Amino acid sequence: MLVKTYSAAVNGLDVTTVTVEVNIVPGVMYRMTGLGDTAVREGRDRIASALQVNGYKFPHADITINLAPADLRKEGSSFDLPLAMAILTASGAVTSDVLADYMLVGELSLDGTLQPVKGALPIAIRARAEKFKGLIVPKQNEREAAVVNNLEVYGMENIMDVIKLLTGREVYEPTFVDTRREFYEQQSRFDLDFADVRGQESVKRALEVAAAGGHNLIMVGPPGSGKSMMAKRLPSILPPLSLSESLETTQIHSVAGKLKRGTSLISQRPFRSPHHTISEVALVGGGINPQPGEISLAHNGVLFADELPEFNKQTLEVLRQPLEDHKITISRSKYTVEFPCSFMFIASMNPCPCGYYNDPTHKCCCTPGQIQRYMSKISGPLLDRIDIQCEITPVPFKDISKAQPGEPSAAIRERVIKARDIQTARYKDFKGVHCNAQMTERMIHQFAEPDEASIALLRTAMEKFSLSARAYNRILKVARTIADLDGSQRVEVQHISEAIGYRNLDRGDWAERRLVIAK
């Protein structure tokens, strides 16, 4: 008897409907076609055990299985459930008239318990697009899948629950998630606040500008100056995620299996802080079965690289293209996977190997050669891609003890949102551009053209600091953001002046100045 059930194969963020065909006739052979990987083929043993524990027998017959389309590689254990239901139906052990109305995904434990799978949300989106009545998933995946409207989602504990649902022996209610209510309730809840930061007003201003324009930023200062503390509070002043951004971000985390149990939608911008020992593959994504890396998990959020020079130099260099393109393409011999990675890159580093250059409370013990080797770990092209570069000095104890609580994140966030609203209106006719940091060169000339006084100031800065052409464009982008924060339609000389101040770590000035002083 030939039976068909339906499942899905996830390739990056793309999902393909898979028809699971099972034909059982007298005989003793077991065959599987359709490019299933090891996890798919091993499903036979899991299915046999799950059926036996729940009172069914794995058929002793000639079983032929095909996973169509046969030329598409199928990976993972999510095919256990559709295979088990197809085998039960083809053998006559169960009868269901609605089997073809549902898409099924789930890994089976040996006792028949359904284990969570990766990619439940994009699978649910595909199921709705294919006009399936419903989707059956493991209980742990039900809330992320139930985000999709106009699709019945059933979260099941074990295979017996699935059998009872599909045979009509019991009636189950589909899972319902009030997506909008949960999304907006959690959107503005932050555990960290800029009010906790005493002093460092100039750095907080730089972070405000970065948040307002979506700019990358690096902070350089001695240990204990507050670099990590401020970076971790950046999400609290960023504009809230839109529902479409939240859905896109949640899909990436779903495919990576990073969603917390019970989570329906990610309602706050991600903050990822990988350790400096991270590999290239873990950072940008890849592997035998390509998975999203940290840069994609930070999509629509923040990627924080603490102690930047401690990262492997080659690992840092692979960031250059994603920072420009806002996507990462992973190529294999027979297919290509693309993950989005539009994130704010925030980095911190010490000013020298010992960490105490320019610290009034500690003496720097580094030689010029040590400083040069330390600085060479960060290439000029990578530094050029960081719009805002600022130095931090420690806050003296007397200032920490006397200072009033800093400005709360909510107040800063209001200004950031107003600036972003200006940018949204400005770029409404430009596809893929939402903030100043994403402006193309032509758009810079259109929206951030400096006046004569600003051009003279820029010329002086370019010559004095040996700035690159890319740095010139970065200055204009940042100046446009500062003007938006001021509510100014034009980029004026004071905006250019502040933006130039955020390029004080460029190679032509900062590294050489340190070597001269160290001597």
Indicate residue ranges for each PLM-predicted region.
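Peripheral, non-AAA+ core regions of ATP-driven protein-machinery
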Residues: 1-218, 222-225, 331, 471-472, ...
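Basic, amphipathic alpha-helical bundle interface domains used for macromolecular binding and assembly
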Residues: 33-44, 59, 66-76, 290, ...
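Walker A/P-loop
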Residues: 219-260, 325
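Walker B catalytic acidic pair
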Residues: 300, 306-307, 318
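The Walker A (P-loop) glycine that initiates the GxxxxGKT/S ATP-binding motif of P-loop NTPases
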Residues: 221, 285, 307
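P-loop NTPase nucleotide-binding/switch module
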Residues: 170-209, 213, 240-295
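Short beta-strand elements
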Residues: 18-24, 283, 387-390
